[in-house]
């Protein structure tokens, strides 16, 4: 549907790339002392708008990896972080909008 929202498979490589970008940007902007990693993409939609806008609902888990000033971790490093014991785990559900314009190349987290 041109201009409309279309459901996307959460395992689609483009969706996974947008999710990884969202996790990195979330952690960069979060005031939490610890990194949150992707548990799963719950739902994904896309919209063609001068590029592609991905609308993602994701579950994130707080890790035991402490943030270091001036040395942000990338997505793969964050995903390799350990989790605290189950009774101490913190899970959050986030909605992200990722706007991808590969010809620029430009990707941004708009929400």
Swiss-Prot record:
Keyword line: Disulfide bond, Protease inhibitor, Secreted, Thiol protease inhibitor
Ranges spanned by the short sequence motif Secondary area of contact, renumbered to the chain: 47-51
Tissue: Expressed by the venom gland.
Domain of life, per lineage: Eukaryota
Record-annotated disulphide pairs: 65-81
Family statement drawn from the similarity comment of this UniProt entry: Belongs to the cystatin family.
Name of this protein: Cystatin
């Amino acid at each position: 549907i041109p201009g409309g929202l279309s459901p996307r498979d959460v395992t689609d490589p483009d969706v996974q790339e947008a999710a990884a970008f969202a996790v990195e940007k979330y952690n960069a902007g979060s005031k939490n002392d610890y990194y949150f990693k992707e548990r799963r993409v719950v739902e994904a939609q896309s919209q063609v708008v001068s590029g592609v806008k991905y609308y993602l609902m994701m579950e994130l888990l707080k890790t035991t990896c402490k943030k270091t000033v001036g040395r942000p971790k990338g997505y793969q490093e964050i995903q390799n972080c350990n989790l605290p014991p189950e009774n101490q785990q913190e899970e959050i559900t986030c909605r992200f909008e990722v706007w991808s314009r590969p010809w620029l190349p430009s990707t941004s987290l708009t929400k």
